[in-house]
Each structure stands twice: as C-alpha cells, then as structure tokens.
C-alpha cells in the first residue's frame, strides 16, 4: 500500500526532467565584431540574446560579426545564427527557438520595456565620444564595453577593451582605459591598412570579405567617389553595400597577411572581451543554462 501511494504521488508530480532551461533575456547594443562576440558568448552560456543596432550599420568586419543580418535577414558566426526581426513582436518567437540570436533595429529602451532583460550591454566600443549613460536605479545589470566607461556612473560594471594583460577585465570600481589612438599593427601595418570615409554617403561595393586585392585596386565607392585599396592584402573589413556612412568612419580594412581565413570567425580580442561580459553576469549570480553548471566559468580562463 505504501508503494502504491508513493507511485501515485510520483505519477502526479510534473515531469521536470525534460523541461527546457529558463533562458533569461540579455540585450547587446552594437553588431560589430565586439558586440557580435558578446552576443555569441551570452547565447552559448545559456542566455537569450537580442542584438540591437540602427538600420544599415557601417561595421566593416562582417565576416567576424552578425552585421549582414541587417542587410539580408540572417547571418552566422562560429556556428550560431542571428535572425533579423523587423517587428518587436517577432523577437520572442525567435528567442523561443532557443537556437539563434534575435537582431533588430528597435531601441534598446523599447526592447527592455517589452522583454524585461536581466542585463544590458553597450558593446559599440565608442572611441571618441563620451560613453552612454546606461545605469538605471533598480533596473537590470548594465555593462559598458569600451574606453571611458566609469563603473557605477555610466554602467554598473565596465569591461576593458584595450590590448594588454587587462583585456576583458571586469571593472567594478573605476574606469576603463582611455582610447589609445593607434591600432595594433598587423604584419607591420598600422593605421595605413584602413580607409576612412572622406565624406558622408551611401557605400557601394562588389567586393567580398576575404577577397585579396592589390594596392591601388578600386574596391568601392561612396556616393560615386572611388575608394582605393591602400595596400596589398585580404579584405578583412568592408562596409556592406548600402551602408550609411558618416565622414571619417572606417569603411575598409586590409589584412596584409593575405590569408582569407583570418577574415572570418571570432577574433582574439572580441572573444576575450566577450568572456569578460559573461564573467560579469556570473559574478552577480545572474546564471542561465550552461553558465549555471559551470561550463562557461571554466572557459573564462582558457
């Protein structure tokens, strides 16, 4: 009789073994290589991710980012897909699939109101402007990624983005380092491997990320003005056709190593920054999915 009663109670309990894990929502602002790496890491750690940027984003490292989702509706990065959501109402349907990131042009404030995220990450890495004020009293955890963020002022915590031993460090008191001003050299080439927009306009190109070009090759135009390759190498960065470009904005990056494989996937710097963002959530015990089982925590120190 005792066994029958126990069996009856067990049968009446809901089967929790096959219940899906709860995936708290996170918002990432900026679909460049850093923002995309952050979104990728959060997704792999078990969080639902909404990646936000404005229409026709100008980011150049499209082989290392989800930027193309804003142009063709979908993009893939290191085995994880992003799907563009034209309507804020479609975002929950994409997140419910649990296998992809939702990309949108809706404001982060509007998405936050609708979805009540546990964290908001500004991963635009703005270099020459004051950081955005994300911190909200009683709101979700806010994380500032990039130079000039002051933890406790602009955001709850900040993530260091400058090359060095502190790259990806979680800063809970104080600020990240100021913008250094000069890019890290690759095969001896520094700023000369970039092309910056001489004027505002619409970008047009028939070239592809990873394509190898020679110095002085015509690779694009900006409202009809030719954009010329500054040196020989592979197109690691190239704004998308139709991108809205501001004067002085980076539109082309040449990798002088001429290896197309280096133009795709998660770069070292974005990956380390993304690990820092996940670590910031773990420190606040904002756990989800594999993070709650320690999988992501182990990968933070690889």
Predicted segment positions?
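Short hydrophobic alpha-helical segments enriched in small aliphatic residues
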Residues: 3-5
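Well-ordered secondary-structure scaffolds
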Residues: 9, 15-302
């Amino acid at each position: 009789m005792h066994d029958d009663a126990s069996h009856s109670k067990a049968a009446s309990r809901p089967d929790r073994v096959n219940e899906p894990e709860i995936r708290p929502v996170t918002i990432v602002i900026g679909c460049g290589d850093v923002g995309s790496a952050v979104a990728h890491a959060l997704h792999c750690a078990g969080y639902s991710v909404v990646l936000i940027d404005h229409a026709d984003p100008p980011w150049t490292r499209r082989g290392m980012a989800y930027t193309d989702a804003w142009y063709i509706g979908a993009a893939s990065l290191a085995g994880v897909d992003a799907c563009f959501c034209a309507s804020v109402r479609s975002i929950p349907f994409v997140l419910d699939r649990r296998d992809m990131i939702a990309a949108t042009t809706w404001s982060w404030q509007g998405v936050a109101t609708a979805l009540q995220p546990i964290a908001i990450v500004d991963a635009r890495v703005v270099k020459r402007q004051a950081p955005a004020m994300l911190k909200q009293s009683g709101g979700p955890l806010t994380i500032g990624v990039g130079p000039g963020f002051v933890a406790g002022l602009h955001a709850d915590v900040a993530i260091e983005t400058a090359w060095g031993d502190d790259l990806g460090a979680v800063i809970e008191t104080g600020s990240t380092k100021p913008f250094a001003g000069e890019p890290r050299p690759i095969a001896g080439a520094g700023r000369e491997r970039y092309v910056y927009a001489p004027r505002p306009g619409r970008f047009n190109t028939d070239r592809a990320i990873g394509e190898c070009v020679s110095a002085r090759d015509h690779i694009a135009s900006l409202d009809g003005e030719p954009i010329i390759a500054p040196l020989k190498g592979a197109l690691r960065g190239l704004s998308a056709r139709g991108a809205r470009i501001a004067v002085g904005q980076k539109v082309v990056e040449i990798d002088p190593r001429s290896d197309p494989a280096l133009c795709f996937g998660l770069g070292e710097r974005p990956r380390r920054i993304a690990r820092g963002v996940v670590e910031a959530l773990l420190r606040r015990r904002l756990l989800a999915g594999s993070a709650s089982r320690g999988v992501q925590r182990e990968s933070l120190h690889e």
